[in-house]
Amino acid sequence: MTTLRAFTCDDLFRFNNINLDPLTETYGIPFYLQYLAHWPEYFIVAEAPGGELMGYIMGKAEGSVAREEWHGHVTALSVAPEFRRLGLAAKLMELLEEISERKGGFFVDLFVRVSNQVAVNMYKQLGYSVYRTVIEYYSASNGEPDEDAYDMRKALSRDTEKKSIVPLPHPVRPEDIE
């Protein structure tokens, strides 16, 4: 049976199998520790019965309550290749959405590479829609061009009029994101 639990510092030394995917954004240890310190409830890991890490989600709460922009943000979601197509990503997303609901969020958002159609389609199946395109959000390496991202959102119950998911009519640049 899969166990969903809080991510711990020790997990940082055990999750390389999950982060080997080229579409997974990886960060330095201080970045992960910052999330653990500030938003521990938004950092969840899935563990197999034998103790192997299967996947994780890392997020945070951000935005302005006054402007009805307080929300949960998915910083990273990744499942190890051998554990994909089991509904694990959907379950991790559901947990982050529940936490965001309890924290009074208006919506949950995330950024995904435009080219990652498998992920885009999964998020759409989970009720997310494209709010805007962010031009050259992902920095490329090896002389490749930078890549655009979709900012995808799902309204939560607090956003009764679904204002947070009305798509923007034009793309934005990373520096225009609040």
From Swiss-Prot:
Instruction: Describe its assembly.
Output: Component of the N-terminal acetyltransferase B (NatB) complex which is composed of naa20 and naa25.
N-acetyltransferase domain location, by residue? 2-157
The organism's taxonomy opens as: Eukaryota, Metazoa, Chordata, Craniata, Vertebrata
Keyword Metal-binding included in the entry's annotation: no
- Which Gene Ontology molecular-function terms are recorded? protein N-terminal-methionine acetyltransferase activity; protein-N-terminal amino-acid acetyltransferase activity
What is the enzyme's class at the highest EC level? transferase
> Major place of localization?
cytoplasm
Which family does the entry's similarity section mention? Belongs to the acetyltransferase family. ARD1 subfamily.
What is the E.C. number?
A: 2.3.1.254
Q: Which domain of life is it from?
A: Eukaryota
Name under which the protein is recorded = N-alpha-acetyltransferase 20
* Gene Ontology BP term (one): N-terminal peptidyl-glutamine acetylation
Gene3D superfamilies hit by this protein = 3.40.630.30
Annotated source species: Xenopus laevis
